[in-house]
Amino acid sequence: MPHVSLQNVTKLFGEDTIALDDVSIEITAGEFVVILGPSGAGKSTLLRILNGLTEPTTGTAQIGGSPVSESGSDVGMVFQMHYLIESLSAYRNALTGALSRTTNLKSILTLNQTDDKRAALRALDTVGLLKDAEQRAGTMSGGQKQRVGIARALVQNPSLLLADEPVSSLDPKAARDVMRYMKQAARERELTTVASLHQVNIAREFGDRFIGVRDGTVIFDGSRAELSMDVIDDLYYAGSESTPVSHGDIEGQGEGLTKPDDTSVSSDMETTSGRDHSTGTDTGTDTGTDTETDTETDTGEAQL
């Protein structure tokens, strides 16, 4: 049984706008799938259907053999905008991911259960931000904020992680950092991951399988080796009078294909909750485009 299944899904907005047109996709547990396509192709609509934020007009969407509406916290979502509470620490923002796992008013008000705290710290460690757990979100770079967004989704303990253009506003270095940590989280936690990206170069580095969407229709479904320049030209430039361009030009950086950085952070999570945050293992610098300079500090947030 596939972990994710879309069968003959069509989504209409109004009477005339077709966002998705008879889309059928099956995704196996543990796959890291990247959805490619030009703006307005239907990528975000597809992810919103998988997350239960919108319903298909016709067709069925299932996760683990059950309707998406029954999946609840089994689905974690990373958005294009991080939607962090910038006055709170990275730790407190990650901790809000626990809200999806309870409807108990007392739990929502306190968010201080030991298991939730441990989950938040483990998630920050997974994305290389444990040493920055007490830093206010408003003082972080764009790339760091997106990594906190990933951590927040991981606190839900999902089996499916969705990411809608998570690196579209970042420079290539920060984008690769975010994608590397996302790929690492998927590997460590055996997550099924579906991410929409428009940077073809970065997508090729991290995806295992690629689904190309154009005008609401799936026109390609294959491996990295099968994602040829002809496929990319057809996906992005079919019907256009513009000259097809290179992989790097699509990304906007004019660079060739490169292999992902294999650097990883510590996977020893059993003692995370007792670790000094100054010993967290963040690899490399983050040059995200968000450069807010709020210098207030958030103290003592992550103490158990």
From Swiss-Prot:
Keywords: ATP-binding, Cell membrane, Membrane, Nucleotide-binding, Phosphonate transport, Translocase, Transport. Its main location: membrane. It comes from the Archaea. PROSITE patterns: ABC_TRANSPORTER_1, ABC_TRANSPORTER_2, PHNC. It holds the Pfam family ABC_tran. Gene3D superfamilies: P-loop containing nucleotide triphosphate hydrolases. One of its GO terms (molecular function) is ATP binding. It is a peripheral membrane protein. The keyword S-adenosyl-L-methionine does not apply. ATP binds at G37, P38, S39, G40, A41, G42, K43, S44. Part of the ABC transporter complex PhnCDE involved in phosphonates import. Responsible for energy coupling to the transport system. This is Phosphonates import ATP-binding protein PhnC 1. It comes from Haloquadratum walsbyi (strain DSM 16790 / HBSQ001).
